[in-house]
Amino acid sequence: MINQKLLVSGADYFTDDYKINPYYTEIKINREKAIAEHARIVECFREAGIEIIKVDPPKGCQDGVYTANWAIVKDGIAVMARLPEARKGEEAYARKKLEEQGIKTYLVPENYLYSGQGDSLRCGKYLFAGRGYRSDPEAQTFVADKLGLELVQVHANPQLNADGSIHINPATNHADSFWYDLDLAISIIDEHTIAYCPGALDEESNKKLEAIQDLDKIIVDYDECTKGFACNLVSTGKHVIMSANAPKLKSALEARGLICITPEITELLKGGGYIRCISLWLS
């Protein structure tokens, strides 16, 4: 079983003051609704038998609701994130909260970007690692070495401007993608199964995934991935808390005997985050 204990915060400071990814639009966020959605997701986690560690969100941090970006945790060890400048206020707070749980923390070297669990998905012996947007490849190598995992680095397709050039996000000054974090393109179903969207990843990355023979793979529909946040789910290996707008993936999971729970979400996704994004896997 996976995702048996999760750390969550809250949407108390969730706003759209700075548009840190392509999902922030001109449509205003309803914070009260976002808080209710967050509470419903946490309720779904508990329905699935998951233990929840609830901490206050860091004050004044609009993206502090997305705890998945705070670190990656394995066997009582956490490698802390190096977030974009707009989220730097979360870093020390996140480390403090994990250390309060008795978790030993390590820091990625200072000159590298690293997006925590958002860009590092562990499945059995593998670490599926995003690079090129919110995480540097050197940071992912550091993480894999520290956690003793076999590194599989992949790269999502970029967001393009009308002229075909790669879009640079003005809030981060980095290249942007609709799959800026890997947990929008790949999900871990159990220790032997992943679900992923080939259309979200470049050709080399697809070849890497296809070459892995000791994992079962579920292909995720491109529209469900991009419009329904299909991959941004939390699975225990028995229950899956997932998008209500991904019927094909839901059917594929139910055909494998998994129980799917599908809360309705409209506000949290406006910040580019969904079910996986608001939860950090502790054990």
Predicted regions span which residues?
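The feature marks the mature, well-folded catalytic cores of soluble enzymes
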Residues: 1-283
